[in-house]
Curated annotation (Swiss-Prot):
Organism whose genome encodes this protein: Gallus gallus
InterPro entries in alphabetical order: Ig-like_fold, PKAT, PKAT_KLD, PKD/Chitinase_dom, PKD_dom, PKD_dom_sf
Pfam families in the record: PKAT_KLD (PF20433), PKD (PF00801)
Lineage of origin: Eukaryota, Metazoa, Chordata, Craniata, Vertebrata
GO annotation terms (biological process): melanosome organization
Family (UniProt): Belongs to the PMEL/NMB family.
Glycosylation site list: 111, 115, 346, 651, 659
Alphabetically ordered keywords of this record: Glycoprotein, Repeat, Signal
Residue span of region 4 X 24 AA approximate tandem repeats of T-[AD]-[EG]-D-[AV]-[AV]-[AG]-[AP]-T-[AP]-[AG]-A-T-A-[AE]-[DS]-[IV]-A-[DV]-[DP]-T-A-G-A: 441-532
Function (record text): Might be required for polymerization of melanin onto the core structure of melanosomes with enzymatic function of tyrosinase.
PTM summary: Glycosylated.
Compositionally skewed regions (Low complexity) per UniProt: 313-323, 348-371
Name assigned to this protein: Melanocyte protein PMEL
Cellular location(s): Melanosome lumen
Domain PKD: from-to ranges: 223-323
């Protein structure tokens, strides 16, 4: 018995010591900002025999790699939209005398001597020992996947953040992709320690690195603002009367928004209105100079794959709550311990709140490759923040525009059966401490209610004291009055879109809130006390005995539940400096220069509109304007107007293409013309000297055609019948076709009608 008791006591002591050792290696600090202690602090277990913890700055760690130090290039694709996937990349940079082969081995790239040992080019830095079976395990004891057996140049990467860790076996480059579902918004640190396999169950730590990343609920965007055919000026200036291009670039490396419906709302700041487009590229022309603030609001409607397609259940408004047809936005809760906002609970993904789904996509030799192995562990005792509902989903922009409190309970939209053929849905408005005024007058309301007069309506509305709200909104029209909506409290107004107000509002007393809504399926006036929180018995009786109003039932179209769409927004704004540039250039005159020298010189008169130029350049090219032969530039003296007289000398006679460009700090304008030098008569005006020679044949042909046409269609009166005169002898018969053609061609026809039939002459 004593021996048995001693064994039990020793076993209990051993269990206690083991528990203390495990508990001493754990850290229960916050998820963010935890200091690196050589291994993930809340690690479930750590095999120190195989994986020695990394200790920064120790002499043992300084000589962990033969031939020099190994550095790391670590990066991530943040900022990451909450719900998307974040990717982390790391690449090992070995000493300059070493290189990585395509199969993953690290070898010497040249002959060298290290610590007195001669190294030959192509030899491995460390002898390769292929681990199989029990030799290949992760730090927490999980075995390598079979795909990692027999691999060369293996490294083990232990990633850690959010109180969780991921283990990946890979080559000299590796990637880790994790989900962000349920992660609170904010900035985080991803840390990684790298181990190299040396054989015999030995994994040597070679370094530690970290990178900062952020999780946001704003769509990350960048906008490129450019203007074509404008010289680049200082300060990002743009020229008026020329289109400015805006190109939006989404930062979505994980393609989280690939199925989203994205719209862009532009306000260019020049009082030109709002442009809504679904194209990421738009252009806008500023007509005035000055400073303008261009703003963009991007809306992404993301379909949720986990949402069902069934229609919302139909609830009797007199017996049950009114179902909310608005976006499924949950109410905000208190801030988390880290003081950041929380992610929405209705986001979908492969991960969960405790363990976001992860995938490993390692790379080798600079190209993507399949992962050799990955192990994901979740900490049961970590301080990771539990996912909380996002207080702002699709209602964020609406609350900001209306100035309402997003923490208040959202009012359900009102289903309206309008007089037209297409029923709609409108959202009610809430007004505190005031009386909502409808668009209809008292007479309109009375006319729409059988048995009610304008005076009755006035009495009904006058019965509501301070703090009451009676008045439908003017968002749409309806033919029916339904039950008051639930949740109307003292001082609130539940708006109804209706054309008539029935008698249930007559019984409202002090402290009551009456707000009828328009229901599509209601056929009669129901009990007005169903949706009010403080209604007296007298008002209930008055409302119940009111004469019912006959309504027409209409079938509302089945709409997709709005809770199946998640709305995310992105914003951008920038200041644009619009200046007046050189808007146009024209060569109005080209004349020969004064007769001096060789005579191969011309003078050009150039005018421009807009700002004054600071520099003028002329380029002389061949007749096809392809090969430049001469270029000259000169400064332009200040002048009150933009008119220049330029002199251009040519080496020899011929036809040339002359290009004139005017430039200043705000823009550039160009004009071209052809110039014929030597032998050609100069043109007094126009853009070329050869215009007369080129157009002369065409003008002559046009004049001849006009004269012939006039001769053919000219009217001639019929002449009186005259006796037939004797005709001279001719070798052609009078009615021959050739004779008639020659007569018409050479004008030999008489001035009268040429047809002998009309002249009553014998043929």
């Amino acid at each position: 018995m004593r021996l048995h008791g001693a064994i039990v006591l020793l076993a209990a002591l051993l269990a206690l010591v083991t528990a203390q050792q495990r508990g001493g290696g754990r850290s229960r600090g916050g998820v963010k900002g935890s200091a690196w202690g050589g291994r993930p602090a809340p690690f479930r277990s750590w095999d120190t025999a195989r994986y020695r913890p990394w200790q920064e700055g120790t002499a043992r760690q300084n000589d962990c790699w033969r031939g020099g130090d190994v550095t790391f290039d670590i990066s991530n694709d943040a900022p990451t939209l909450v719900g998307a996937r974040a990717t982390f990349s790391i690449a090992l940079r070995f000493p300059g005398t070493q290189t990585v082969l395509p199969d993953g081995r690290v070898v010497w790239s040249q002959n060298c001597t290290v610590n007195g040992t001669r190294m030959l080019q192509g030899d491995p830095v460390y002898p390769e020992q292929l681990a199989e079976g029990s030799d290949g395990v992760f730090p927490d004891g999980q075995p390598f996947p079979r795909s990692a057996w027999g691999k060369r140049g293996r490294f083990v990467y232990v990633w850690w953040t959010w109180g969780r860790y991921w283990q990946v076996v890979d080559g000299a480059t590796s990637q880790l992709t994790v989900g962000t579902d349920g992660v609170a918004l904010g900035s985080y640190t991803m840390e990684v320690v790298v181990y190299h396999y040396r054989g015999r169950q030995r994994f040597i730590p070679i370094g530690h690195a970290s990178t900062q990343f952020s999780i946001t609920d704003q769509v990350p965007i960048a906008v490129d603002v450019t203007q074509l055919e404008v010289a680049a000026g200082d300060g990002g200036s743009f020229v008026r009367n020329r289109p400015v291009a805006f190109n939006v670039r989404l930062h979505d490396p994980s393609h989280y928004l690939r199925d989203a419906d994205i719209s862009y709302s532009w306000d260019f700041g020049d009082q030109s209105g709002t442009l809504i487009s679904r194209s990421p590229t738009v252009t806008h022309t500023y007509l005035q100079a000055g400073s303008f603030a261009a703003r963009l609001v991007l809306q992404a409607a993301i379909p949720l794959s986990s949402c069902g397609t069934s229609a919302p259940p139909v609830v009797d408004p007199t017996t049950g709550p009114v179902p909310s047809l608005g976006p499924t936005a949950t109410q905000p809760v208190g801030p988390t311990g880290s003081g950041t906002a929380t992610a929405p609970s209705n986001l979908t993904g492969s991960g969960t709140a405790a363990a976001p789904g992860t995938t490993a996509a390692p790379r080798a030799s600079g190209a993507p490759a399949e992962p050799t192995g990955v192990s994901v562990a979740v900490l049961s005792d970590s301080a990771a923040t539990e996912p909380l509902p996002d207080p702002v989903l699709s209602t964020a922009v609406a609350d900001a525009a209306a100035g309402t409190d997003p923490t208040a309970d959202p009012l359900p939209p009102t289903s309206v059966s309008s007089g037209g053929d297409a029923p709609g849905t409108v959202a009610p408005t809430a007004v505190e401490g005031s009386v909502a005024a409808g668009v209809g007058t008292a007479e309109d309301v009375a006319a729409a209610t059988p048995g009610a007069t304008a005076a009755d309506v006035a009495v009904d509305t006058a019965g509501a004291t301070d703090g009451d709200a009676v008045g439908p909104t003017a968002a749409a029209t309806a033919e029916s009055i339904a039950d008051p909506t639930a949740g109307a409290t003292d001082g609130d107004a539940v708006g109804a879109t209706a054309e008539s107000i029935a008698d249930p509002t007559a019984g409202a007393t002090d402290g009551d809130a009456v707000g009828p809504t328009a229901a599509a399926t209601a056929e009669s006036i129901a009990d007005p006390t169903a949706g009010a929180t403080a209604v007296s018995s007298g008002s209930a009786t008055a409302g119940a005995t009111a004469e019912p109003l006959l309504l027409v039932k209409r079938q509302a179209p089945e709409a997709e539940p709005t809770g199946c769409v998640l709305y995310r927004y992105g914003t951008f704004s920038t200041e644009l400096n619009i200046v007046q540039g050189i808007e146009s250039v024209a060569i109005v005159q080209v004349v020969p220069a004064a007769p001096e020298g060789s005579g191969n010189s011309v003078e050009l008169t150039v005018t421009c509109e807009g700002s004054l130029p600071e520099e003028v350049c002329t380029v002389v090219a061949d007749a096809e304007c392809r090969t430049a032969q001469m270029q000259t530039c000169s400064a332009v003296a200040p002048a009150p107007g933009c008119q220049l007289v330029l002199r251009q000398d040519f080496n020899q006679s011929g036809l040339y293409c002359l290009n004139v460009s005017l430039a200043n700090g705000n823009g550039l304008a160009v004009a071209s013309t052809h110039v014929a030098v030597g032998g050609a008569s100069p043109a007094a005006s126009g853009t070329t000297l050869t215009v007369g020679l080129l157009w002369a044949p065409l003008i002559a042909a046009a004049l001849g055609t006009a004269a012939y046409t006039y001769r053919r269609v000219k009217y001639s009166p019929l002449l009186p019948t005259a006796p037939t005169a004797p005709r001279p002898h001719s070798w052609l018969p009078p009615g021959a076709t050739l004779r008639l053609l020659l007569r018409q061609a050479f004008g030999g026809a008489p001035s009268g009608e040429s047809s002998p039939l009309l002249r009553a002459n014998a043929v």
